Amino acid sequence: MNHKLPQHIAVVMDGNGRWAESRGLPRVEGHKAGLDSVKKIINCCLEKKISCLSLFAFSSENWSRPVTEVNFLMELFLEALRKEIDDLNQHGIRLKFTGDREPLSQVLQKQMSDAEALTKNNQQLILNVVVNYGGKWDIVTAARKLIRTVLDGKLAYDEINEAVFAQFLDTKGMPEPDLFIRTSGELRISNFFLWQLAYTELYFTDVHWPDFNEHEFELALISFSKRARRFGQISQSE
């Protein structure tokens, strides 16, 4: 493709359960199938030299799902991390994890920290896995940290601006997404990156995540290439 490409893509991988149910399978089978799509999209990003891919793996609201499904998701996440980390590292992928880790198991937390440490110097792609995250949580937590910094005398009140505030978010140091993709026909962002998506181009598709392949990814990129990103300004034609 010769058209412009996004440098940071954020994805809500929706529809695993619906994909499975439509085939008469348990919902957990959809989550397993969804891992194949993750691998495909990671490879696409590497081929197209996209800098950052954020995957919304588990939201803070997902704890309300059946306990058996939540437990399966956590085990699947841990198993996938253990199995794929060496391959990700060999391909120059840097792993980052965004979200509140405290409620996660100690075993999973350690695996996440070890993966970050192992891949910290890799530069081919930042793979940001978003786990136990909510946009409102991120903003409130950032506000608390900011207030504490001001009270400690490390920052003056009149020094606070958008750039300063962003440094207190859990995504600090990462570029804001250029393209947001959500699968499975849901037309909302569901408390994901509320601050970070301010000027992001949104792309929605009816395709369930396990069916989101290289072709579907290409369609999203083509759609992005046709957008005129104005960042609140008017276009030259206007």
UniProtKB/Swiss-Prot annotation:
**Comment on bound cofactor:** Binds 2 magnesium ions per subunit.
Q: Which UniProt keywords apply?
A: Cell shape, Cell wall biogenesis/degradation, Magnesium, Metal-binding, Peptidoglycan synthesis, Transferase
SUPFAM superfamilies given for it? Undecaprenyl diphosphate synthase (SSF64005)
Positions the record marks as coiled coil are none
Binding, Mg(2+): 14, 201
Query: What name appears for this protein in its UniProt entry?
Result: Ditrans,polycis-undecaprenyl-diphosphate synthase ((2E,6E)-farnesyl-diphosphate specific)
Pfam families from the entry? Prenyltransf
Q: Which family does it belong to?
A: Belongs to the UPP synthase family.
- Name the gene for this chain: uppS
The residues the record assigns to binding substrate are 15-19, 27, 31, 59-61, 63, 65, 182, 188-190
* Phylogenetic placement of the source organism: Bacteria, Pseudomonadati, Pseudomonadota, Gammaproteobacteria, Legionellales
Q: Which cofactor does it need?
A: Mg(2+)
Spell out the subunit comment. Answer: Homodimer.
Query: Which species is this UniProt entry from?
Result: Legionella pneumophila (strain Lens)
EC number(s) reported in the record: 2.5.1.31
Q: What's the superkingdom here?
A: Bacteria
Catalytic reaction equation(s): 8 isopentenyl diphosphate + (2E,6E)-farnesyl diphosphate = di-trans,octa-cis-undecaprenyl diphosphate + 8 diphosphate
